[in-house]
Amino acid sequence: DIELKLSTRPEKRVGSDELWDRAESALASALDSAGQPYDLQPGEGAFYGPKIEFSLKDCLGRVWQCGTLQLDFNLPIRLSAEYVSEDNSRKNPVMLHRAILGSFERFIGILIEHYEGAFPAWLAPTQAVIMNITDKQADFALEVEKTLAESGFRAKSDLRNEKIGFKIREHTLLKVPYLLVIGDREVEMQTVAVRTREGADLGSMPVAQFAEFLAQAVSRRGRQDTE
């Protein structure tokens, strides 16, 4: 959920009321033209201009301010910033202060809480993990990792001398979207057995087919990519 808020002139500010009227009117008109509902926040603007705030709700229903768009008629004048207009006269430009994410750390925190660590494939730090059952499959597991990496995916191998059930459980708890298991049959057939972190068994498929599947999951940009 995204909430939009229009923050207007604070008590302590720079610039004339005329400039503030123009700036506030411009932002309100932009919101109205876009058909976006918004709340008015009197007195919450920056000292140099009004702003539109984009606030996000996390999984607990808390509201966090993230992106902002501020319209500033004042600082260009104070900085003596000018441009030559079509009639060859010098005019002061209008400055837009745009923060797409706001605080980067806060935005990452919201994403982590929203997805509860189970990032969709396009966002997951590790998109797929390749696990061998015995040492005999280690070389093929590394080949699969290299193939996926060369295709632009974030994949890694887990070649530890642990039971496959232990590896699957561990990477499921780490919420890696796709778990690839390689045994003797997979080496013989040059395939991978694909599971999701939710426990769904997608069966065996050639590495190229899985790469296509993962590419489609990434392109969807959402949780449904593991369904």
Swiss-Prot record:
An individual GO BP term: threonyl-tRNA aminoacylation
Q: Which Pfam families match?
A: HGTP_anticodon, tRNA-synt_2b
Q: Where is this region: Catalytic?
A: 1-120
EC numbers for this chain: 6.1.1.3
Coiled coil located at which positions? none
The entry's localization annotation reads:
Cytoplasm
For this UniProt entry, the molecular function terms from Gene Ontology, in alphabetical order, are:
ATP binding; threonine-tRNA ligase activity; tRNA binding
InterPro entries according to UniProt: aa-tRNA-synt_IIb, aa-tRNA-synth_II, aa-tRNA-synth_II/BPL/LPL, Anticodon-bd, Anticodon-bd_dom_sf, Thr-tRNA-ligase_IIa, ThrRS_anticodon
List the CDD domains hit by this protein, alphabetically. ThrRS_anticodon
GO CC field: cytosol
UniProt keywords, alphabetically: Aminoacyl-tRNA synthetase, ATP-binding, Cytoplasm, Ligase, Nucleotide-binding, Protein biosynthesis, RNA-binding, tRNA-binding
Spell out the reaction equation it catalyses.
tRNA(Thr) + L-threonine + ATP = L-threonyl-tRNA(Thr) + AMP + diphosphate + H(+)
Instruction: Tell me where on the tree of life, at the top rank, the source sits.
Output: Bacteria
Q: How does it assemble?
A: Homodimer.
Q: What does this protein do?
A: Catalyzes the attachment of threonine to tRNA(Thr) in a two-step reaction: L-threonine is first activated by ATP to form Thr-AMP and then transferred to the acceptor end of tRNA(Thr). Also edits incorrectly charged L-seryl-tRNA(Thr).
Q: Can you tell me which family this protein belongs to?
A: Belongs to the class-II aminoacyl-tRNA synthetase family.
Q: What is this protein called?
A: Threonine--tRNA ligase
